[in-house]
């Protein structure tokens, strides 16, 4: 990556960050796969090489709303938020607003997915 970063290695099952953690940095997957999970364990995403995660909390300036866990052994680049913030500060305000809006919608969609998953689990348990 062209940003200031630190290479991190995680073994399968390692937690990279948990719900409620401060959103300090974002991550770029170099190798392996990362599972993004809700507070009740619903897998909201399965990310692989070249994908970024951890950006939502930074963009909307809130604590982590999901848990990121290594699904396989993996190498990720922890990207310094300061460098990304400079890019956002220099970006077209319309693009920044779109990015923030999309990030908020991702959070809302994750909450809705978990709610529906929990309701489905209750219905299945009644069968």
Regions found by a protein language model. Give the residues of each.
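Regulatory nucleotide-sensing modules
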Residues: 1-37
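Short hydrophobic/aromatic patches on the structural cores and recognition surfaces of FHA
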Residues: 13, 32, 50, 68, ...
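Short alpha-helical scaffold segments that flank and stabilize functional sites
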Residues: 35, 71-73, 112
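Cyclic-nucleotide recognition modules
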Residues: 46-99
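A small-molecule sensor/coupling module
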Residues: 84-123
């Amino acid at each position: 990556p062209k940003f200031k970063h630190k290479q991190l290695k995680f073994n399968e099952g390692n937690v990279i960050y948990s719900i409620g953690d401060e959103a300090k940095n974002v991550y770029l997957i170099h190798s392996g796969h990362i599972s993004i999970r809700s507070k009740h364990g619903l897998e909201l995403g399965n990310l692989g090489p070249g994908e970024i995660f951890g950006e939502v909390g930074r963009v909307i300036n809130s604590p982590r709303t999901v848990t990121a866990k290594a699904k396989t052994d993996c190498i990720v680049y922890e990207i310094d938020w300061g460098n990304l913030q400079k890019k956002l500060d220099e970006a077209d305000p319309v693009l920044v607003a779109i990015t923030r809006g999309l990030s908020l919608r991702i959070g809302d969609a994750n909450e809705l997915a978990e709610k529906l998953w929990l309701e489905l689990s209750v219905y299945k348990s009644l069968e």
